[in-house]
């Protein structure tokens, strides 16, 4: 029979890779929790309405969601991103009424898009979200968390931070109209995708990967010419904090995020080492989303890290240094010695519970087992012998 393979764009993570993933996830978790953030968990499947209500015109909703009807006929979707689900969970569990929670979560997301280096149909994110705070200080905290993380992983010097301010709703409406008026003059040069974005959410055209469209946009109006004084002051205060902390940045007036709910601060950490998939972390404010999803008005901000891309970069730069946690490797040459070895291993763990012990029960040749013991990285390899006919037959009696 033919073997069954994984779905295209959905990848297995084998044991050696899991060690790398666990290392990276633990580093991120330790940094985030050192700032008082707490873990939250919520389902990977939600009502489709959760995503259509929060991102009606976004590509992930119009083209990329895994959506189907369950047996009751209700439309449900695999989560394409985590923020909407986190907001829903915070509202459902009444986390926002008396507190200003700082939360983190990690797990798989799903988007039906063309698989390529650094981009899969099932991918993983580590995210942090903050609710109830509307000052530039909390925006700065999230950026400082990410900067500290990059330093701990040894890649800070190779990354660049880009920041923009999308203003309030009126700013985005005025700017969108100006953008449409400008781009309409180039309608014959716009591709089908650009025309769709121009109709549904003009700001999204700024994120186009088309060189021809980016050339046109060089002369397009900038959103900073439409933001009000409050937004300008907000961004100035944020940048002042980053200057004080020595975190370099570039203000990119064309930076937008791929989801519709962002306002005011948006930011990305990028690298030049991964080709077109250059964004490692993206985040921003979404002050209207809680109310849009049925909660009371509540400011919020968050970021997400693409774990596949981060681990790809760390391996490329040889920044993952794994140490084995195996203390003892038992080598056995017969069923009798194997039995004695597993009993001995259990007694050792009874005495010292923290011991990590692996027993080879394959009964391979001596050479093969010694090679495996060496490859395991164990601190000690123990040869388990009994004077039996089996051992004598092996020439070890």
Segments the model singles out, each with a brief description of its role:
Residues 1-389:
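TRNA-recognition modules of translation machinery and tRNA-sensing kinases, especially anticodon-binding
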Residues 387-397:
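Single conserved hydrophobic/aromatic residue that forms the stacking wall/gate
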């Amino acid at each position: 029979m033919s073997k069954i393979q994984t779905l295209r764009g959905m990848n297995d993570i084998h044991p050696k890779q899991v060690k790398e993933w666990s290392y990276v996830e633990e580093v991120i978790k330790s940094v985030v929790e050192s700032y008082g953030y707490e873990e939250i968990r919520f389902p990977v499947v939600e009502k489709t309405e959760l995503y259509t209500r929060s991102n009606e015109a976004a590509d992930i909703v119009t083209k990329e969601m895994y959506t189907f009807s369950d047996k009751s006929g209700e439309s449900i979707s695999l989560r394409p991103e985590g923020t909407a689900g986190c907001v829903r969970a915070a509202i459902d569990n009444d986390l926002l009424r008396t507190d200003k929670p700082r939360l983190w979560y990690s797990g798989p997301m799903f988007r039906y898009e063309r698989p390529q280096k650094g981009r899969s149909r099932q991918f993983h994110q580590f995210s942090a979200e903050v609710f109830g705070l509307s000052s530039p200080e909390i925006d700065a905290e999230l950026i400082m968390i990410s900067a500290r993380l990059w330093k701990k992983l040894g890649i800070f010097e190779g990354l660049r931070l880009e920041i923009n301010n999308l203003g309030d709703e009126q700013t985005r409406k005025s700017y969108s109209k100006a953008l449409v008026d400008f781009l309409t003059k180039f309608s014959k040069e716009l591709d089908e995708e650009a025309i769709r974005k121009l109709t549904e959410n003009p700001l999204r055209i700024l994120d186009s990967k088309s060189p021809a469209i980016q050339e046109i946009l060089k002369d397009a109006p900038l959103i900073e010419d439409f933001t009000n004084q409050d937004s300008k002051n907000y961004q100035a205060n944020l940048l002042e904090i980053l200057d004080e902390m020595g975190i370099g940045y570039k203000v990119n007036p064309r930076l937008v995020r791929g989801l519709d709910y962002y306002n005011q601060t948006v930011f990305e950490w990028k690298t030049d080492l991964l080709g077109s998939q250059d964004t490692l972390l993206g985040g921003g404010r979404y002050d209207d989303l809680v109310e849009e999803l049925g909660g009371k008005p509540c400011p919020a901000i968050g970021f997400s890290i693409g774990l596949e891309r981060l681990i790809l970069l760390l391996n490329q730069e040889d920044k993952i240094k794994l140490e084995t946690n195996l203390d003892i490797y038992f080598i056995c040459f017969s069923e009798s010695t194997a039995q004695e070895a597993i009993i001995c291993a259990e007694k050792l763990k009874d005495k010292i519970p923290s011991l990590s012990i692996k027993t080879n029960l394959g009964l391979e040749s001596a050479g093969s087992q010694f090679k495996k013991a060496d490859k395991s990285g164990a601190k000690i390899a123990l040869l388990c012998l009994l004077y039996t006919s089996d051992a004598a037959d092996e020439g070890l009696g």
